[in-house]
Amino acid sequence: MSVELAKVSILGKECVHVGYQIHEHIVKSTLEHCKSSTYVIINDTNVSKVPYYHDLVSLFEKSLPEGSRLLRYDVKPGEAHKSRETKADIEDYLLLEGCTRDTVIIAVGGGVIGDMIGFVASTFMRGVRVIQVPTSLLAMVDSSIGGKTAVDTPLGKNFVGAFWQPQFVFVDIKWLETLPQREFINGIAEVIKTACIWNGEEFARLEANAETFLSVVNNSQTVSVFSPHHNETVELTYTNIESMLEHTYKLVLESIKVKAHVVSSDERESGLRNLLNFGHTIGHAYEAILTPQALHGECVSIGMVKEAELSRYMNILSATQVARMVKILAAYGLPISVNEKWFKELTLNKKTPLDVLLKKMSIDKKNDGSKKKVVILEKIGKCYGTSAHVVSDEDLRFVLSDETLVHPFNNIPEGQNKVITPPGSKSISNRALILAALGKGTCKIKNLLHSDDTKHMLNAVQQLKGATISWEDDGETVVVHGQGGSTLTAPSEALYLGNAGTASRFLTTVAALAKKDGKNDHVILTGNARMQERPIGPLVDSLRSNGLKIDYLNRQGSLPLKINTETNFKGGKIELAATVSSQYVSSILMCAPYAEEPVTLSLIGGKPISQLYVDMTIKMMDAFGIKVTTSTTEPFTYHIPKGNYINPAEYTIESDASSATYPLSFAAITGTTVTVPNIGSASLQGDARFAVDVLRPMGCEVTQTATSTTVTGPPRGQLKPLKHVDMEPMTDAFLTASVVAAICNNGTTNTTTIEGIANQRVKECNRIEAMVTQLAKFGVRANELPDGIQIHGVNSISELRQPSDAGIETYDDHRVAMSFSLLAGMVNSDKKDDESSVRILERQCTGKTWPGWWDVLHSQLGARLDGAEPSTTKSSEVKKSVVIIGMRAAGKSTVSKWCAESLGYRLLDLDEEFERQYGKGTVKDFVAESGWDEFRKEETRIFQEAVDKYGDKGYVLSSGGGIVERSESRQALKRFAESGGIVLHLHRDIEETIVFLKSDPTRPAYIEEIRDVWERREKWYHECSNFTFFAAHCSNEIEFRNLRHVFSNFIRRVLGAEKIPVPSRRSAFVCLTFEDLSDHLSKLDEITYGCEAVELRVDHLSSFSSDFVTKQISLLRAATKSLPIVFTVRTVSQGGKFQDDDYDLLESLLKVALKNAVEYIDLELTLPNNILYNVLNKKSNTKIIGSHHDFAAKFPWDDAEWENRYNQALSLDVDIVKFVGTAVSFDDNLALEKFRSTHTLKPLIAINMTETGKLSRVLNNILTPVTSKLLPSAAAPGQLTLAEINQLYHQIGGLPAKKFFVIGSPIGHSRSPILHNTGYELLGLPHHFDKFETEDIEVVKKELLTREDLGGLAVTIPLKLDIIDSMFELSEAAKTIGAVNTVIPLGKNKFRGDNTDWLGIKNSLVSNGVPSSVSGSAGLIIGAGGTSRAAIYALKQIGCDTIYMLNRTTEKLQKLKSEFSEEYKIVVVESAEQTESIKEQVSVAVSCVPADKPLDPELLNKLERLLAKGTNSSFKPTLLDAAYKPSVTPIMKLARDKFNWNIVPGAEMLVHQGVEQFSKWTGAKPPFKAIFDAVTQE
């Protein structure tokens, strides 16, 4: 196949040549027209892998004339190398090769190469000739045309460059064959852009060919080819360009023509050329945030939609044109919103804050100073004016946000008179599409509503092959080519209908007419979450009774539906309950002519709802050739004959009468005039009566002809309430009437009563309830009636209340949003200069029926609008609750209490809530009386109510074991998890559970074996939960406390209450390669000494079952005190043991990791994209390490492989990059360090394996993989212990030896030296800790604070206060406690004073079973000395509500209390009698009195009374004695023996405060157990 070679002129020269397979033409033209001694082909290493590149180079070499030479230069790929440094490297190469001014440079590549090499050519030898050979679609149509060249700088893209026109641009379509699919689609954005601004005909051609294009590109394949340049087989994408060659050639050529024309008219971008930036002002702002995950064209696509919406908002571009643009971008596979699910996943759910977008937009070359300029469209193919226009931040904010601020309508002039034409009726549009699709012949439908609903309907009609659709009149007319229903067939994919209720009901019956297509023997209708709650049951029941097989795939009575195509629509007598929705009636009516027999449709259950809509359907069927007759003998019965619709040549949709109520009501409330020119008394729609039946009685002047309606409102504040109005003929309009009624008051009454609207409870939301709820925010009282609403209007407009910043909920309901947009503007509208505003949420939902409503309200009716980010008030109030599920006896009740205490949440036990509501006994009693099935139904109801009420309010909901038994409960659990809630599966070993349950008589008995119950439920627990915690069996109190501690850390990390930051200093993790950790638990603590994390090599485990792996994670956490886990499944090709291609098992293991909330997942960058993105989008608070290993020593550190993988890691936005090479020579370590120094955008772990590579491990900065002497072998060649790394680092000068001292007097018995020196020795640190005894601070200043090798000071009495004056800064703890026990050098003779005594107290308590948050409990402190101050601070930090203090004398305590703020809630206990009034649980105590003196009897009496108040604590009450000799003090003995308190010796406090010092000084993680043992041994 071939196409003709086209030549396009730029600046008077035919220099752009476009064709297919034009290598010979490229070489011939270059050698003929650009004679030179030296030709240099410059490309990136990705292009040099393509065989077509080698064909070009080979042909060039063969064709060179004598005396000429060809040089080639490869650069590293990617935007990161479009830099001044790369440019300099290229120039140095050219100079070294002796290139002179006659050199011709040929740039072969995408936009990065074209831009950069063009800039090289413009400056080398003050300018040499350049030829562009673009290889990507984006480069072909954009960057290669026009002579703009540049490189990036750290401050921005393309900031340094020049205009330098190429001699030729050779555009060879053949290059696109190997362009990756996403890059291909990325380039299409620029093609569509040029058609939008200049070429309407080409836009229409692009529309017509979209399906073919996307089909070809999406079916591209990966092929293996040999690359001579790389001497290896490489994988490339192959797209069958020849199958759409004419279309591709044309789209490239036409796009180039537009840009060439514009460039020729305005080469230096002074005016016309900036039209080429349509979509780029906003698109570039998105790109700046979303790069590198999002591509340029993807962001420009979103930018085009936003800038088109801005044009519509300014009343310049029609809604139809915007709809066409949105449709074509989506049709070519481009994103149209940052909120599209696939695009959000691709960009890893990055946020695009409004203020950041505006800031990015302010840095744009089109701007006029601080004024932002945007290209405005007039219509498809034509811009508004000849350059970009200045737009306000206010308008930009509106377009960019989904929340609207409506300012008071105090700017609307009296006497304003407007003509507003609402879009086509949704009801008529949807019916017309169904009738035309079922009809025979071509029908041109005019004024069709372009909305989400009709978009879904059009797509569905085409998917069902019911008709072909085309467009005329710039998209204003839809042309339906109907086939009389004969071609309806089942599609291979589900019909997605969003929240389009009308479409779902009409299409249910249409789908029943479809025939089987090959293997496709059913049609699935589905929609969004709200659509899957809306009712469709009566229609389905009716169709089922007529012989059709229809299944619900989720909840009964709602979508999704599965409609079998092998059963037929029989017809005959059909009965239908029509008291809920008239759309059920219309659905059967419209499809009835295609039943096997004539249909008699009887509506049962009472008077049908919305009769006027049924009449509308019948009248429209008549217009399409089928006459329905109403029975004269049976009520609400219709006879429909068999037949085919005959499509009228043209059908015009009248405007939507429901939508017309909004501008007409605007006139009513503002005292102005509005005319709707195409809705009058002859309308098919019941809502056309709104002005006459509602607004006129309210006091408006109404003029209505057969085809138009005009409303003039009375002076503001003079509308009258309606005593009663039946809105059954126009139910959708009740919302508009309600907001108008909110400001109605005739002086004697203010109550409006609306009835006949019961069906509004099952629309997009329960609209009656929504209206009552939201009106209340304006201070308007309303109440529900059985089939209506009563509104009690305010006495005057000035009484309308300003809603809070949380805003007005719209419930994703277009009519709620539009109605409240009117009332919002009336708030403060009586105050002339008031700038307040009312926030309306989810404004985009108006796209369902009137996408341009806000534009009309703003640009035509004159309202002032602004946009806003979602309110922080609202998001800060949301505390996602935790639902705990699991088998009976898994420990849910206990763990739920732990959970609530750890998070500061409230606890609701759902079984207890059931018993409270039941009121007649226990669950066991109810089951005995009513059976399990009834209990399960009630359980579901109570759970759903609890989630609705408490789901965002910080609750722990503890469920019964069988909550997963009912499908409805499972769906509710899944929905809660999908909405961001935590559904935690608490799991225990099933064997232990069985033993326990068999011995517990208090629970209702299972009617089957416990193991069978578990096997049935197991999969449900897994599928309903988004997190899992395995609670190991505890055989003693210590294990139980440890489990609580581990769980507390786990749940706080899940909720983000405890963050695990990526280390910013030297750190390590130890690698475990055991088959089963349970055999090595006693050694794990010591193995992990000094490490910030521990790697679980899952590929080495003996089993990959999810249960086994979950247990291993649990064991590891318990044994290492919740040390962060690196979860690694290393594949064989990356040096591990896991099979390379077992992706299903790998995905299941990664899912286990995510559900167990491991702190890190090592994700190999060679894995398929779908696995990578799946993990990245579900990672929650888990950090991702993107890793790549080169075991074969195939890639030196300057190879493009590492660069490509680094760019890949950046695009995936992993948290840490981990690269492991293999050192062959010592120089490989130096090459690695050079790579490390230039790759600093992400934390980087970079090491070399083998003995030769050990230096790289020593020099690595963060999370270096290490081994331990206690492990049988290292996990990788050359791996070192942490101590070895530190010793080597010291020896090469990286870790200078420091001196540390404890200062004060007396310190002869101080354990600090042994504490710290033990840690230094174990971790291989070169430091030494000694005693320095003195009482004189001046000696300390002179002899210690001046030492250059000083690492830190531990300060004890009497210097804790004296040292403060020598400190440059103090920590918050030191300031509050008023003492310093830790001195940290800051450099330059400056020091920071800190206090770790409080951490010694806090961590001693927490490590002995006290929750990290004890909210609801009180604390107790005995003593008034210096340690008491630290104790006060510590107890406040763990959340004690009140702190009680005891001492022999209270004077010191009163002074101490006065030195702390009231928020500490310190209560000095003066007498024993005072303790009687204390009602709180006293659960935590710290003794700060000497242990070598007997306690005062009165103090002892008060102490005993307070210790007695710990008996009902939710955790075991715990006392710490700060004295560490003797090991059990008298107070400890009293608390333990008499009051059953848990006791903690002072030695633990000593060690805990000491290891905190150790960590602050060295940055290393101290080996706690070894230090503790060393300190406490006598």
Curated annotation (Swiss-Prot):
One annotated GO molecular function: metal ion binding
Residues noted as binding NAD(+) in the record, renumbered to the chain: 44-46, 79-82, 110-112, 115, 135-136, 157, 175-178, 186
Catalytic activity: 7-phospho-2-dehydro-3-deoxy-D-arabino-heptonate = 3-dehydroquinate + phosphate; 3-dehydroquinate = 3-dehydroshikimate + H2O; shikimate + NADP(+) = 3-dehydroshikimate + NADPH + H(+); shikimate + ATP = 3-phosphoshikimate + ADP + H(+)
Amino acids binding Zn(2+): E190, H280, H296
UniProt: 7-phospho-2-dehydro-3-deoxy-D-arabino-heptonate binding residues: 126, 142, 148, 158, 190-193, 259, 273-277, 280, 296, 365
Residues forming the catalytic site: E269 (proton acceptor), H284 (proton acceptor), C845 (for epsp synthase activity), H1189 (proton acceptor), K1218 (schiff-base intermediate with substrate)
Region (EPSP synthase): 406-863
Region (3-dehydroquinase): 1072-1284
Involved pathway(s): Metabolic intermediate biosynthesis; chorismate biosynthesis; chorismate from D-erythrose 4-phosphate and phosphoenolpyruvate: step 2/7; Metabolic intermediate biosynthesis; chorismate biosynthesis; chorismate from D-erythrose 4-phosphate and phosphoenolpyruvate: step 3/7; Metabolic intermediate biosynthesis; chorismate biosynthesis; chorismate from D-erythrose 4-phosphate and phosphoenolpyruvate: step 4/7; Metabolic intermediate biosynthesis; chorismate biosynthesis; chorismate from D-erythrose 4-phosphate and phosphoenolpyruvate: step 5/7
Keyword set, alphabetical order: Amino-acid biosynthesis, Aromatic amino acid biosynthesis, ATP-binding, Cytoplasm, Kinase, Lyase, Metal-binding, Multifunctional enzyme, NADP, Nucleotide-binding, Oxidoreductase, Transferase, Zinc
Its job: The AROM polypeptide catalyzes 5 consecutive enzymatic reactions in prechorismate polyaromatic amino acid biosynthesis.
Family statement: In the N-terminal section; belongs to the sugar phosphate cyclases superfamily. Dehydroquinate synthase family. In the 2nd section; belongs to the EPSP synthase family.
Name of the protein described by the UniProt record: Pentafunctional AROM polypeptide
Source organism of the structure: Kluyveromyces lactis (strain ATCC 8585 / CBS 2359 / DSM 70799 / NBRC 1267 / NRRL Y-1140 / WM37) (Yeast)
Gene: ARO1
